[in-house]
Amino acid sequence: MANKKEYVVGIDLGTTNSVIAWMKPDSSVEVIPNAEGARTTPSIVAFSKTGEILVGEPAKRQLILNSERTIKSIKRKMGTDYKVKIDDKDYTPQEISAFILKKLKRDAEEYLGGEVKKAVITCPAYFNDAQRQATKEAGIIAGFEVLRIINEPTAAALAYGLDKKGKEEKVLVYDLGGGTFDVSILEIGDGVIQVVATSGNNHLGGDDFDQRIIDWLAEEFKKQHGVDLREDKQALQRLRDAAEKAKIELSSKLETDISLPYITATAEGPLHLEMRLTRSMFESLTRDLVEMTRKPVEQALSDAKLKPEDIDEIILVGGMTRVPMVQKFIKEIFGKDPNRGVNPDEAVAVGAAIQAAILAGEEGAQGKDIVLVDVTPLTLGIEVKGGLFEPIIPRNSTIPIKKSKVFTTAEDGQTEVEVRVYQGERPIAADNILLGSFRLVGIPPAPRGVPQIEVTFDIDSDGIVHVSAKDLGTGKEQSMVVSGRHQLSEDDINKIIEDAKKFEEQDKRRKEEVELKNKADDLAYYIEKSLKEYGDKIPADEKDKLENLVKDLRDAINKNDIPRIKMLFDELDREKTKIGEYIYKQNQQGGNQQAENQ
């Protein structure tokens, strides 16, 4: 029996819907329909009472009757310790996501008549390390060899950017999906797609627009009948489906009728919901949600040091960008219409398929030399003496990237160091987010400042962070992969960046104070060491003076008395030159004495 042909795919694993695509030998990209014949698959998993696992449209169809055993928007929980409990079994977000990926894989294999093994899977640009790891794990559980995890906006730009060879452009990707909003600014040209800035909101998307319609319908119905449909799970699910349908219809129509017969019943009999929703009413219900995308857009422009008029193209991703009010809002900011040449629902999967074909060296990708360059959303570094944050990889650095810095010990005879890894923009480590820590042990005892410890940060092409510390004297090394299960949303990241700006003056002062204390401690250490070595060459009164100054300085450091530290540091700094004078004077006298004796 002949071996089955192997196919390479790109997958958009979305909050609301997922899409799978492949590149044909003629270089065109085809979105693969699922078993139900649709080009998008709802990211929904259900466990039926009989133990059957339903995924996609079948799961969505029975959501009303089985809402407690149906999981949607699991992507929001990726990278956390969240568990779904069904029949005494706990499922991780990776396992639930793997059910979705397995269905995509199975349906693609059926459609293509071969094996689908290798895949590029996308995630939001703002997914942190733990969330990216979880996405990769979901792919592995589903039976894929995950070639790479790439950012959704980067993938969309790739779908768009192939036709733009030879022309340098600044492109803004506005991605408003079912559960997340991402905005990215990219530079495209000469076969390179570089992300220069990213921003967004991890909890803003189509679900929120649906909720506004649900609340409006429920409130209107309550006024008419005195019944709140949101308290009845089945009625609420029917409202949710109707709201989504109405929202979609209002992108092409000015009004839509919502009819839900037998939505509930009272003692008097059954009740029916019949309402008309106009586009203008929908816009007034959701205008503030669209407005919430303004700040991330401005943040991305600010990070890229660009003005709206510097953007050559705006491309839309996510079904929500079909909403006329969203397109009008974008035109108001940029003074130009967004490019509609990319299907917003499929662009990400198409880009992922192109990248997959390039990485796997597929026939259709021959001659397509595309380089994707992603960036780190926040600065990465470690805690150093005095609790300061020492950046190693700055925010918005292109990845993959590897950077090292050499550090030393803070105490005499220190035989181990703790490497504490942080992410953030503040100069004091404790004000940033601790990603994890590890210890490097077995450092040979030596005076402080002598050992050489090289700390290396290595971010791979999936955005996963590897940190290592190496004692350059012994070659001993310790490392870790940052996989702390903390969820850092886009809101959190934007807040971190805003806080850094807000506390800039205060942080600058605190940093200067810590640096002064560190310098004072180093000076006190130097004087003590010098007095030990050369004390016999220094007059007793001068030696006493220096010892008292060191004692007072250490006391001021312990009490955090900044003005006194500064005063004593300056005085001790002036006095330290006398040590050298006395040493050289003694040596000269000794030398002259020797010359006379000869």
Swiss-Prot record:
<dbReference type="GO" id="GO:0051082">
    <property type="term" value="F:unfolded protein binding"/>
</dbReference>
<keyword id="KW-0597">Phosphoprotein</keyword>
<keyword id="KW-0547">Nucleotide-binding</keyword>
<dbReference type="InterPro" id="IPR029047">
    <property type="entry name" value="HSP70_peptide-bd_sf"/>
</dbReference>
<dbReference type="InterPro" id="IPR043129">
    <property type="entry name" value="ATPase_NBD"/>
</dbReference>
<comment type="similarity">
    <text>Belongs to the heat shock protein 70 family.</text>
</comment>
<dbReference type="Pfam" id="PF00012">
    <property type="entry name" value="HSP70"/>
</dbReference>
<keyword id="KW-0143">Chaperone</keyword>
<dbReference type="InterPro" id="IPR029048">
    <property type="entry name" value="HSP70_C_sf"/>
</dbReference>
<feature type="modified residue" description="Phosphothreonine; by autocatalysis">
    <location>
        <position position="180"/>
    </location>
</feature>
<dbReference type="GO" id="GO:0140662">
    <property type="term" value="F:ATP-dependent protein folding chaperone"/>
</dbReference>
<keyword id="KW-0067">ATP-binding</keyword>
<dbReference type="GO" id="GO:0005524">
    <property type="term" value="F:ATP binding"/>
</dbReference>
<dbReference type="InterPro" id="IPR012725">
    <property type="entry name" value="Chaperone_DnaK"/>
</dbReference>
<dbReference type="InterPro" id="IPR013126">
    <property type="entry name" value="Hsp_70_fam"/>
</dbReference>
<keyword id="KW-0346">Stress response</keyword>
<dbReference type="InterPro" id="IPR018181">
    <property type="entry name" value="Heat_shock_70_CS"/>
</dbReference>
<comment type="function">
    <text>Acts as a chaperone.</text>
</comment>
<protein>
    <recommendedName>
        <fullName>Chaperone protein DnaK</fullName>
    </recommendedName>
</protein>
